[in-house]
From Swiss-Prot:
One Pfam family it belongs to: MMR_HSR1
Name of protein: Probable GTP-binding protein EngB
GO CC field: cytosol
Entry keyword annotation includes Cell division: yes
Gene3D superfamilies hit by this protein: P-loop containing nucleotide triphosphate hydrolases
Organism in which the protein naturally occurs: Coxiella burnetii (strain RSA 331 / Henzerling II)
Cofactors demanded by this protein: Mg(2+)
Gene: engB
Family: Belongs to the TRAFAC class TrmE-Era-EngA-EngB-Septin-like GTPase superfamily. EngB GTPase family.
């Protein structure tokens, strides 16, 4: 068995580097899975729970604060990537445009990118910018997995109802998009998302 055939040790994640510009990205080799979502949708909390490392990805009380791409190494060849959050109304238009250019360049040109996890608060799914990000990734032929986070905030029936509604809304994209319920609070869906990530890491280039 080679190093690429075994499941990644997510608990071994370590901060690698941050990039504010496309030319600051680490070498485009190995395999990466990126996480993206609206500010305060629970993206950083999801990364912390998946790796089991509290504080790995910084959570912020100020939406839109993080405007850099953060890389976390699982091993020499595999990385998790925390893309900057979006959708905060108080961010100046110039900052928003810079975010769009940086993220679009990353999604379009990053050859080692295996998949994109789109994080959405289950109480506010599929906002306009969520749909824009999905369109970008679909156009660049990037597999997408949606995490409907904070599922513990809804009753079980309400969460399942929202899951079904989002599934219907994205059905036109076909098998390129998958989704699940997730909660960093009670760990709902943790094994499921880890299985998706591991499958992506094991996929052929």
């Amino acid at each position: 068995m080679t190093e690429f055939e075994s499941a990644p040790a997510y608990q071994e994640a370590k901060y690698l580097t941050s990039a504010a510009e496309f030319d600051q990205l680490p070498p485009d080799q190995g395999a990466e899975i990126a996480f993206i979502g609206r500010s305060n949708a629970g993206k950083s909390s999801a990364l912390n729970i998946i790796t089991g490392i509290k504080g790995l990805a910084r959570t912020s009380k100020t939406p839109g604060r993080t405007q850099m791409i953060n890389f976390f190494a699982l091993n020499e060849h595999e990385r998790l990537v925390d893309l900057p959050g979006y959708g905060y109304a108080k961010v100046p238009r110039m900052v928003q445009k810079r975010w769009e250019e940086l993220v679009d360049s990353y999604l379009k040109n990053r050859r080692c990118l295996k998949g994109l996890v789109v994080v959405m608060d289950i109480r506010h799914p599929l906002k306009e910018m969520d749909e824009d990000v999905i369109e970008w990734a679909v156009n660049y032929d990037i597999p997408i997995h949606i995490l409907l986070t904070k599922s513990d905030k809804l009753s079980q029936n309400a969460a399942k109802k929202t899951l079904g509604e989002v599934q219907t809304a994205i059905s036109a994209y076909g098998e390129k998009l998958t989704l699940q319920l997730f909660s960093s609070h009670d760990r709902t869906g943790l094994d499921e998302v880890k299985a998706v990530l591991s499958q992506w890491f094991r996929s052929e280039p």
